[in-house]
């Protein structure tokens, strides 16, 4: 699935009072919650300064959308090699996040002006898979 990437300026155009912050992805966890139909949840704790945000991606809540998001994140952050990568081995990954109204709205490559906007990713996902 083709995921749209945006520049920082383009993301600022989508959200009022947006602010970019340097951050660290502490780790990536996928949890299957044993109630409400065995919901799959993606948990990616992100540290911004002294604050740890435990689940800014709460709208990513199905097995397929978790996979699509992880693939988009790996492509964005240029994680991986020919042998694959164990998600459990990933930690302390530098990134940039854009926050608007105390909500993480986009994540970006630390070295490049490239961001994934969660709202756009979910819209693209729903158009492709929830017809």
Where are these regions (language model features)?
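Short beta-rich binding modules
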Residues: 1-131
């Amino acid at each position: 699935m083709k995921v749209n990437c945006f520049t920082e300026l383009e993301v600022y155009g989508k959200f009022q009072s947006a602010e970019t912050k340097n951050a660290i992805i502490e780790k990536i966890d996928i949890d299957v919650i044993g109630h409400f139909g065995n919901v799959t949840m993606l948990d990616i704790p992100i540290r911004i300064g002294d604050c740890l945000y435990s689940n800014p991606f709460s709208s990513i809540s199905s097995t397929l959308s978790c996979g699509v998001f992880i693939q988009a994140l790996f492509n964005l952050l240029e994680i991986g090699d020919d042998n694959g990568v164990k998600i459990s081995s990933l930690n302390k990954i530098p990134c940039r996040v854009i926050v608007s109204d105390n909500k993480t709205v986009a994540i970006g490559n630390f070295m490049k002006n490239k961001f994934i906007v969660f709202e756009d990713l979910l819209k693209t996902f729903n158009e492709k898979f929830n017809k």
